[in-house]
Design a protein with these regions (language model features):
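Catalytic-pocket segment enriched in acidic/His residues
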Residues: 9, 13-23, 29, 83, ...
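Extended, compositionally biased flexible segments
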Residues: 1-85, 91-95
Length: 205
């Protein structure tokens, strides 16, 4: 299983972290190790040696068939389910890596950094590009977004990635985070929502 993720895919998030609303010339793709997966309901143990850890709430899609060099017009055939995930990010390390022109492998891919919710068949949604989602921490909404605000749409991302990587059944794609990211703390209770469906819930320890 491969875990793909896209950075800088919501303009407001780009503004809050990078000071620009500009769409990147190409999708900003990174990957996580399979040991990054944190399944629904499992606690997230905050690493004590990585500095500040931020939540980044994202819509995630699941690849359902083998594909390479997929035309964008056919990309919708290659994923079958949607959920909410958290792309946990070691923010201090990310800043240092970015300033040094280094990759995000550690700051984005450490163990447990890819929380994943309950999968919902994509047919349950009228339009993948019009899904509202949000994250509650300790009962308070801290981040919310809509997939209509993506700079690169899901089908565009899949077509782009498949130029470089063969997509396989079970691969997953984190599609980017809106504005409102922030730190997590021990004893925080996180709940992720797709529309009115709670699909993700766990505690930080």
């Amino acid at each position: 299983m491969k875990i793909f993720a896209i950075g800088m895919n919501y303009a407001a998030h780009n503004q809050e972290l990078h000071g620009t609303l500009k769409r990147p010339d190409e999708p900003v793709i990174f990957t996580k190790a399979d040991s990054a997966i944190l399944n629904q309901g499992k606690p997230f143990f905050i690493p004590d040696h990585l500095g500040r850890i931020d939540y980044e709430t994202e819509v995630v899609v699941r690849i359902c068939r083998l594909g390479k060099n997929i035309p964008e017009r056919f990309a919708h055939r290659y994923y079958d389910a949607v959920t909410v995930g958290i792309d946990f990010t070691a923010r201090d390390l990310q800043k240092k890596a970015s300033e040094a022109g280094q990759p995000w492998t550690i700051c984005k891919g450490f163990d447990g950094s890819a929380a994943i919710g309950e999968w919902i068949p994509k047919e349950k949604f009228l339009d993948i590009q019009r899904i509202h989602f949000h994250l509650d921490i300790n009962g308070k909404t801290v981040q919310e977004g809509c997939t209509s605000d993506m700079l690169y749409k899901v089908d565009e991302i899949i077509a782009y990635i498949s130029q470089f990587f063969t997509l396989k059944t079970g691969d997953i794609l984190y599609t980017g985070t809106p504005s409102g990211v922030g730190p997590v703390h021990i004893d925080d209770h996180l709940e992720g929502w797709l529309e009115e469906r709670k699909v993700l819930e766990f505690n930080c320890k």
